[in-house]
Amino acid sequence: MKVEVDSFSGAKIYPGRGTLFVRGDSKIFRFQNSKSASLFKQRKNPRRIAWTVLFRKHHKKGITEEVAKKRSRKTVKAQRPITGASLDLIKERRSLKPEVRKANREEKLKANKEKKRAEKAARKAEKAKSAGVQGSKVSKQQAKGAFQKVAATSR
C-alpha cells in the first residue's frame, strides 16, 4: 500500500482518498482534503498555517530528532612546483620585498627597451644599405611596363 503525502499540509493520503491537481507545467500536487486544496489555490503559505506539518517543523513544535551536523573535510592547499620553477624558487620569489620586486621589474623593462632600440637601429641600417644599392625608385606600374601617357605635341 503506497501512502502519498499532501503537497500543502504534509498529511498522509491513503489509497482512494484525496485529489490530484496537475498544473500547466505538468507539476502534480496531491491534496488530502478540500481544505488544503482550497488554501493552496488561495496561494497561502503552509508555513504560516498552524495545523500544517511545515508550520510545526518551521516553529520547532513537537518531538524532533536532532540531526547530526555533517562534517565537511577541510581542503588543504598543497604547494606544487610549476614547470620550469622549483618549489624553492617559488618560495624565494614570494618572500621578495615589494621594493626589490619593483627594482627587478624596472631593470628588465630597461633591458628590453635597449634590446628593441638596438634592433630598430640595426633594421634602419639594413634599410639604408639596401636603398643605396637599389638606386632610383621606380613605381610598380612602370616596372611592369604599363602604358605610358604620351604628351600632346600639337600645342
Curated annotation (Swiss-Prot):
Q: Where is this region: Disordered?
A: 66-155
Provide the leader sequence positions: none
Q: Which SUPFAM superfamilies match?
A: Glucocorticoid receptor-like (DNA-binding domain)
Spans traversing the lipid bilayer = none
UniProt GO BP: cytoplasmic translation; translational elongation; translational initiation
Record key words, sorted = Cytoplasm, Phosphoprotein, Ribonucleoprotein, Ribosomal protein
Compartments where located: Cytoplasm
Name a single GO cellular component: cytosolic large ribosomal subunit
Q: Basic and acidic residues compositional bias: what residue ranges?
A: 89-129
Q: Pfam families, alphabetically?
A: Ribosomal_L24e (PF01246)
- Extract the GO molecular function terms from the UniProt entry: mRNA binding; RNA binding; structural constituent of ribosome
Question: Where does this protein chiefly localize?
Answer: cytoplasm
Instruction: Show the InterPro entries listed in the entry.
Output: L24e/L24_sf, Ribosomal_eL24, Ribosomal_eL24-rel_N, Ribosomal_eL24_CS
User: Which residues carry the post-translational modification Phosphoserine, per the record?
Assistant: S7
Has the keyword Metal-binding been applied to this entry? Answer: no
Q: Which family is annotated?
A: Belongs to the eukaryotic ribosomal protein eL24 family.
Job of this protein = Component of the ribosome, a large ribonucleoprotein complex responsible for the synthesis of proteins in the cell. The small ribosomal subunit (SSU) binds messenger RNAs (mRNAs) and translates the encoded message by selecting cognate aminoacyl-transfer RNA (tRNA) molecules. The large subunit (LSU) contains the ribosomal catalytic site termed the peptidyl transferase center (PTC), which catalyzes the formation of peptide bonds, thereby polymerizing the amino acids delivered by tRNAs into a polypeptide chain.
Q: Other comments?
A: Present with 36900 molecules/cell in log phase SD medium. There are 2 genes for eL24 in yeast.
Q: Which PANTHER family match?
A: 60S RIBOSOMAL PROTEIN L24, RIBOSOMAL PROTEIN L24
The subunit structure is: Component of the large ribosomal subunit (LSU). Mature yeast ribosomes consist of a small (40S) and a large (60S) subunit. The 40S small subunit contains 1 molecule of ribosomal RNA (18S rRNA) and 33 different proteins (encoded by 57 genes). The large 60S subunit contains 3 rRNA molecules (25S, 5.8S and 5S rRNA) and 46 different proteins (encoded by 81 genes).
Protein name, please? Large ribosomal subunit protein eL24B
Query: Which species expresses this protein natively?
Result: Saccharomyces cerevisiae (strain ATCC 204508 / S288c) (Baker's yeast)
Q: What is the lineage of its organism?
A: Eukaryota, Fungi, Dikarya, Ascomycota, Saccharomycotina
